[in-house]
């Protein structure tokens, strides 16, 4: 029993170490590719709050939460290659990137998740062809969360300081206050929630 408790403690410590260092590496990579840190930090904050609120519905674990976090940080990296085809550029950059403590399969999950947005979530089929059925379902869930989070900062001006979330039956209600114009965010939010 003592060995199991120690092993569990060590595993949790190791997972925290991996998550911290993988996120640090992703931020360094995002800086290299000229990603806007205020934007990706806002998207991260929103996405992780949504992930945590929907945990009972999506059933994904902490490792999948880390994949979502890294995808949020790096979702704009493809603009470095081509601003007109940034999603494909993001996929190409990330699919072969080695992330600290993660497997090649997990890098592919990050690449596929990061290379979607509210307008192209369904259109990108090639990345999904490289995934198992189980991982396709995981990525679909993560993409949906990322799209909603990205829509909340579509203008990349961090218009919402905080959001609050309420789960009512199977519906997620997002509350956000601001005195700024949020027409673009409302439009993008509508695109990814219909």
Describe the predicted segments one by one:
Residues 26-30, 39, 45-165:
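Divalent metal-dependent catalytic cores for phosphoryl transfer on phosphate-bearing substrates
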Residues 1-16, 45-48:
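Oxyanion-binding/catalytic loops of NTP- or PPi-dependent enzymes
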Residues 40, 142-145, 185-192:
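Generic alpha-helical secondary structure
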Residues 2-10, 70-76, 165-172:
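Core structural elements
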Residues 35-37:
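Cytosolic transmitter module of two-component histidine kinases
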Residues 155-194:
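Low-complexity, glycine/alanine/valine/leucine- and proline-rich hydrophobic stretches
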Residues 9-32:
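Long, charged amphipathic helices and adjacent flexible linkers at domain junctions
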